[in-house]
Amino acid sequence: INIGSKLMLSSIASMLIMGTIRFFVQQQWSIQTFGKLSFTLSISNMFLTFINAVGIVMFPLLRRTNRDRLSSLFQTLRGVFVPLTYAILIFYIPAKIVLGMWLPEYEVSLRFMGILFPIVIYEGRMSLLINTYLKTLRKEKTILMVNVLTLTLSLLLSLFVIFIIGNLNLTVGLILASLAFRCNLAEFFLCRDM
């Protein structure tokens, strides 16, 4: 129960990182603006669903791996995964062209996509590599701490950026910055513990 509750709270905090920003955008700007941002996030989530499915398969494999080999295996997987996810960004331009012709009224969404598409890199690395490894090493408390810290930081910064500065592009950039911070912080703790 102790491990499960930490993972559940961690998962809720992780969802709220983007969820609170989406909520504040909905409160501050029009429903059309919110819809365009949500469209972009939905496309990013489509890629993340595939990556999460691979992460679910990896966990049992890592649990059976000798603990002494986990560090070298992490370096190998990271060496494959990071360039692969950066390569996915190449598809941004063709996707923008095709979607621009198909949905011309969503031009703003396509601009957001350029900022938010890198979410796939950070969220993918987080769910496929870092969280899977932290769970394998029984570091659920670290996952929870990183997600709660990122949620707190994201919440405070989003209140400032959305309601005081009032800049939508900065708000969209804040989503990416929050997820990049979470990924890098979790990876720091993972590398320190391995």
Language model: regions and residue ranges:
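Interhelical loop/hinge segments that connect adjacent transmembrane helices in multipass membrane
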Residues: 1-18, 57, 61-71, 190-194
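Residue-level recognition of pore/gate-forming positions within transmembrane alpha-helices
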Residues: 15, 42-45, 120, 150-152, ...
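Helix-loop junctions and terminal segments of transmembrane helices
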Residues: 44-68, 130-136
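Alpha-helical transmembrane segments of multi-pass membrane transport and lipid-handling proteins
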Residues: 51, 74-124, 152-164
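Membrane-interface junctions at transmembrane-helix termini in multi-pass inner-membrane proteins
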Residues: 120-148, 188-194
